[in-house]
């Protein structure tokens, strides 16, 4: 089933914090995107106001159910903004994570990365996630005992097919997140992100719009079907998943 998760806490070292409005979208078929914009960017953050962003298809993640509410997910991201931008001391390769369901309905994610090299010391991290109802306009907490919303939430995924770009848009219920990156650019000028919310009125509201080519990202998702093509300002996107 599709899922929309809001991050509540990020921790490296002894002091937890949360400086972002992070939402992660996971489609019914397992495609995913996580956008992590700063709430109050400052200084150098103003030019690229993101802690991080990553995305991938279900071919870039291995999911294993360990039982008792524990799942491991091993990621080889399609887009990793730190890698794309060649940020110093960035982990390269697979990221191994463990997800544990809490009785409250929150989900704890733990793992480790190797920013200084695979043969160097690891850096452990911890994140806490709250599933929210993607069929609602507001960020409504999902009760651990009532997930009927999941059967009604649409799950649509579009992937760019142009040789000059990589791109993915994931529609989960009313919430849309997407990225578009220029291949072989590797600067912030080559990155574009959107986060949209479909309101009760039927109109979509931009919660996040970043980049000079956001108009190449589709922003209408009606009358689609799997395998069809959507053209947005000259860029072709393929519908790789459609559950509505």
Curated annotation (Swiss-Prot):
Gene Ontology cellular-component annotations: cytoplasm; nucleus
Record-annotated disulphide pairs: none
Keywords carried by this UniProt record: Cytoplasm, Nucleus, Phosphoprotein
Location in or out of the cell: Cytoplasm; Nucleus
CDD domains, A to Z: HRI1_C_like (cd11693), HRI1_N_like (cd11692)
Modified residues (Phosphoserine): 143
Record carries keyword Cytoplasm: yes
Record flagged with keyword Zinc-finger: no
Family label: Belongs to the HRI1 family.
Subunit architecture: Interacts with HRR25. May interact with SEC72.
Name of the protein: Protein HRI1
Species annotation: Saccharomyces cerevisiae (strain Lalvin QA23) (Baker's yeast)
